[in-house]
Amino acid sequence: MKNYSKNATYLITVLLFSFVAMLLIIPSKCEAVSNDMQPLEARTADLVQQPRYIIDVPPRCPPGSKFVHKRCRVIVP
C-alpha cells in the first residue's frame, strides 16, 4: 500500500508542477505572439488604400494673376 501512495504523491507533484509551468509559460507566449502581430496589422492597415475624395477647388491667386499649369501666373497686358 505504501508503494501506491508514494506513486500517487509523485504523480500529483508532477502534475501540479506542470500545471504551474503552463500557467507561467502560456501567457508569455501569447503576449509575444500579440506583439509580433501588432506591426503586421499596422502594415496591412497602411497597405489597404482607402478611397480618397479629391475635390478640385481652384486655388486663389492674387489680383492681376491667373492660375495656369498649377501655378499662379501674372498676366502682363
UniProtKB/Swiss-Prot annotation:
Matching InterPro entries: Secapin
Tissue expression from the record: Expressed by the venom gland.
The protein, known as: Secapin
A Pfam family annotated for this UniProt entry: Secapin
Positions annotated as propeptide: 33-52
Localization per Swiss-Prot or TrEMBL: Secreted
Disulfide bond annotation, renumbered to this chain: C61-C72
Cellular component, GO, one term: extracellular region
Principal location class: secreted
Species of origin: Apis cerana cerana (Oriental honeybee)
Domain of life: Eukaryota
Record keyword Heme present: no
Membership in a protein family: Belongs to the secapin family.
Signal sequence, renumbered to the chain: 1-32
Keywords, ordered alphabetically: Disulfide bond, Secreted, Signal
Role this protein plays: Nontoxic peptide.
